[in-house]
Curated annotation (Swiss-Prot):
Organism of origin: Shigella dysenteriae serotype 1 (strain Sd197)
Origin: domain of life: Bacteria
Coiled coil: none
PROSITE patterns linked: SBP_BACTERIAL_1 (PS01037)
Keywords, alphabetical: Periplasm, Signal, Transport
Keyword Transport: yes
Protein name (record): sn-glycerol-3-phosphate-binding periplasmic protein UgpB
GO biological process, one term: transmembrane transport
Length: 438
């Protein structure tokens, strides 16, 4: 009977091992990172999984930011939400009002993991913090600011100094004309036109985008980006467009491809576009700060962040939340946050990641890689330049795109377009305000 005894023991051991194998907690993570950025997300997840065999982070690309947010909210309503959802910065107010989230600080507390919220760069963490408690609602991940990318080889050909990018919008208009005259198909193009030409233009030049400190002080805010300074700026771009010096190529990041394929000599785009530019550009390029308005009294002020943060969804079990907390803690560790910053161009979200990157000599070896960080820290933010917290902001951005396109096509004047955008946008703000009180 001994063989039977050994067989039974072996069977019991095998079943135990199978049980352990099946005990791995799967943690779905929906994101909007594609191309080189998606590869780095996968790399971080694989490394975490190797170090934490009881958990398995499963990253899934769910489309652009708007698509991912819509998919996440829809999945929550049917009880199929991921554990972690990446949401862009202007979706913050929507997520806060959704009743679909588990605040990050609660997740760490319940998991029994000590987590220092003060490690994050204040300009970044302030965007995603509860204005009442100061605690993080979501964890900063891929934060960015717009920067100016320029083709140094094209600058040389046009007789411009390749080490001196334009500092003001007035300079940029002059440079774009010279670059176009030198044979470039496109002197200047912009990605994310609403975010860069109105949201960040306003902050960088010390102007409010909306009342109530851009919505941080209440849901009864109204839009204010149809003032003379913003109208003048859009009018300048309109004139450049008529001359052929500014090319409108799309609402999102289309200008980055136009830049790295050599069509456009300059573009303003996300600092997170650096990964793809580094990969695909076949020419010498530089990274400069966003231009500012030469007539703005105290410009430049500070850039406001774009990008996204990681939200934890409600309705998961304790083991899932423990795994989520471990993964978020992993992402914030200096070596991992520094790697993400260095490989992608996104901001170092923690002070330690910035210090480590500097100590490693990365900025010396890669001039311009710290441009986005310097913009963000240029001056302490004013109450109305620390970001936007406006309800229905994704839909407001669509309205802004539509109205700016009416300028580029000659259907409306800049004043008419911005007035209409403000009027239409305020209707959405009132709808959101009403929903939060019901």
């Amino acid at each position: 009977m001994k063989p039977l005894h050994y067989t039974a023991s072996a069977l019991a051991l095998g079943l135990a091992l199978m049980g352990n194998a099946q005990a791995v907690t799967t943690i779905p993570f929906w994101h909007s990172m594609e191309g080189e950025l998606g590869k780095e997300v996968d790399s971080l997840a694989q490394r975490f999984n190797a170090e934490n065999p009881d958990y398995k982070i499963v990253p899934t690309y769910k489309g652009n930011y708007e698509q991912n947010l819509s998919a996440g909210i829809a999945a929550f309503r049917t009880g199929n939400a991921p554990a972690i959802l990446q949401v862009y910065e202007v979706g913050t107010a929507t997520m806060m009002a959704s009743k679909a989230i588990q605040p990050v600080y609660d997740v760490f507390k319940e998991a029994g993991i000590q987590f220092d919220e003060s490690q994050f760069v204040p300009t970044v963490s302030g965007y995603y913090s509860d204005s009442k408690t100061g605690h993080l609602l979501s964890q900063p991940f891929n934060s960015s600011t717009p920067v100016l990318y320029y083709n140094k080889d094209a600058f040389k050909k046009a007789g411009l100094d390749p080490e001196q990018p334009p500092k003001t919008w007035q300079d940029l208009a002059d440079y774009a004309a010279k670059l176009k005259a030198s044979g470039m198909k496109c002197g200047y193009a912009s990605g994310w036109q609403g975010r860069i030409q109105l949201e960040n233009f306003s902050a960088w030049n010390g102007l409010p985008f909306a009342s109530k400190n851009n919505g941080f002080d209440g849901t009864d805010a109204v839009l204010e980006f149809n003032k003379p300074e913003q109208v003048k700026h859009i009018a300048m771009l309109e004139e450049m467009n008529k001359k052929g010096d500014f090319s409108y190529v799309g609402r999102k990041d289309e200008s980055t491809e136009k830049f790295y394929n050599g069509d456009c000599a300059m573009t303003t785009a996300s600092s997170g576009s650096l990964a793809n530019i580094r990969e695909y550009a076949k020419f010498n390029y530089g990274v400069g700060m966003m231009p500012y308005d030469a007539d703005a009294k105290d410009a430049p002020q500070n850039a406001i962040i774009g990008g996204a943060s990681l939200w934890v969804m409600q309705g998961k079990d304790k083991e899932t939340y423990t795994g989520v907390a471990k993964f978020l803690d992993f992402l914030a560790k200096p070596e991992n946050a520094a790697e993400w910053h260095q490989k992608t161009g996104y901001l170092p979200i923690t002070k330690a990641a910035y210090d480590l990157t500097r100590e490693q000599g990365f900025y010396e070896k890669n001039p311009g890689a710290d441009t986005a960080t310097r913009q963000m820290l240029n001056k302490p933010p004013l109450p109305f330049t620390k970001g936007l917290r406006l309800g229905n902001m994704p839909q407001i951005r669509v309205i802004v795109d539509e109205e700016l396109e009416s300028v580029w096509t000659g259907k409306k004047t800049p004043q008419q377009a911005l007035d209409t955008a403000v009027e239409r946008g305020n209707q959405l703000l009132r709808r959101f305000e009403k929903s939060t009180k019901s």
